[in-house]
């Protein structure tokens, strides 16, 4: 094993994994929202509920970015946003650049998202996916 040089080794984020009570259904939502194809799915494991499984989406050709993975969480509890003491906390969220916030909000709602009650910024809209994960639509430069 080599000694550290003081510089970080090459580390590259390749995926973001999202917990879901039905990962294939949530992948379908994000596929419609983003226009990405679902690249891989896995069925429920033997002895697990039908919702068990896994799905992965990759950016379309020409777009650079990590894959989005969706994995089964049997005891999934939707996060509360903004956070409240003693309630399920947000672990991560997606920021999605858009050309027009209003158009993007309408699109997101048409495929199954809803706007969060709290909207802290004028040029950003906090949306909730079908299982309650927040994601932000923000005006790109």
List the predicted regions and their residue ranges.
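Short, acidic, Ser/Thr-enriched surface-loop or helix-capping motifs
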Residues: 129
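Conserved, structured core segments of small domains
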Residues: 59-86, 90-97
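Short active-site oxyanion
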Residues: 13-15, 92-93
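A detector for short, charged/polar N-terminal pre-domain segments
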Residues: 2-9, 81
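Core segments of cupin and vicinal oxygen chelate
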Residues: 6-11, 17-68, 103-106, 110-118, ...
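Short beta->alpha transition motifs characteristic of CBS
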Residues: 119, 137-141
């Amino acid at each position: 094993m080599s000694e550290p040089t003081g510089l970080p080794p090459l580390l590259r984020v390749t995926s973001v994994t999202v917990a879901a009570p039905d990962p294939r259904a949530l992948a379908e939502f994000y596929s419609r929202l983003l226009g990405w194809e679902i690249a891989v799915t896995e069925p429920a494991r033997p002895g697990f509920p039908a919702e068990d499984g896994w799905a992965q989406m990759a950016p379309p050709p020409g777009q650079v970015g990590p894959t989005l993975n969706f994995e089964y969480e049997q005891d999934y509890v939707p996060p509360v946003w903004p956070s409240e003491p003693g309630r399920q906390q947000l672990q991560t969220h997606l920021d999605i650049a858009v050309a027009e916030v209003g158009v993007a909000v309408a699109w997101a709602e048409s495929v199954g998202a809803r706007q969060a009650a709290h909207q802290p910024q004028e040029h950003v809209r906090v949306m909730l996916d079908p299982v309650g994960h927040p994601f932000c639509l923000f005006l790109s430069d």
